[in-house]
A protein has these predicted regions:
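Position-specific recognition of the canonical hydrophobic site in helix A of tetratricopeptide repeat
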Residues: 31, 58, 65, 92, ...
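Helix-start (N-cap) detector for alpha-helical repeat units in TPR-like alpha-solenoids
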Residues: 20, 54-55, 88-89, 122-123, ...
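Alpha-helical segment of the N-proximal tetratricopeptide repeat
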Residues: 18-55, 59-66
Length: 180
């Protein structure tokens, strides 16, 4: 490349990048306004220009997940993870989608990967607790909720879930004592 070609390429790259940021912002606004179809079209336009755009893949996945298209959301997260395997946001979102699809063991694998990278991820701890609870591992679930609360004592999801799991354990113990 000549010096002028390099400068032109650089300027074009900045223009395209700015345009993509604007499109992603518009897609987010569409989602907030409930215009899901327009948001998805914008994400697809961005991905046509930049197939490896992690933000577009993630936000598209979240949008699909929010309208109940869990398998498509997981596909979007998988594409993002193939590009950036340790992206915490993508791993958390994929875990939540797998949880919604009742694939609790696979969800836990996502949360465990987050926790390997960030031991103090309150969201990963609480979400893992939810998946453990769904599998009937209430003691382990409570342990994860408590750990999340030890990091952030105001984390509502962990607090409410811990109380619910403890109530379930009490009711199970009560039922067992009645049958004995």
């Amino acid at each position: 490349l000549t010096k002028n070609q390099f400068i032109i390429e650089k300027k074009l790259s900045v223009i395209v990048s700015d345009k993509i940021d604007v499109m992603l912002g518009q897609a987010f606004e569409c989602t907030e306004d409930g215009d899901i179809s327009a948001a998805l079209k914008l994400y697809d336009l961005v991905l046509k220009k930049e197939p490896s755009n992690i933000r577009a893949l993630t936000d598209k996945g979240v949008t699909l997940q929010n309208i109940g298209k869990i398998k498509l959301a997981i596909n979007s997260y998988n594409k993002a993870l193939s590009i950036s395997p340790d992206n915490l946001d993508v791993l958390l979102n994929k875990g939540a989608a797998l949880h919604s699809d009742e694939q609790y063991q696979d969800a836990i694998k996502c949360y465990d990967k987050v926790l390997l990278i960030d031991k103090k991820s309150t969201m990963a701890l609480a979400y893992k607790g939810l998946s453990l609870g769904e599998l009937g591992h209430l003691h382990d679930a409570i342990k994860h909720f408590k750990k999340a609360l030890s990091i952030d004592k105001y984390y509502d999801l962990a607090n409410i879930s811990k109380e619910l799991a403890q109530d379930l354990l009490k009711s199970i113990k009560k039922e067992k004592s009645k049958t004995q």
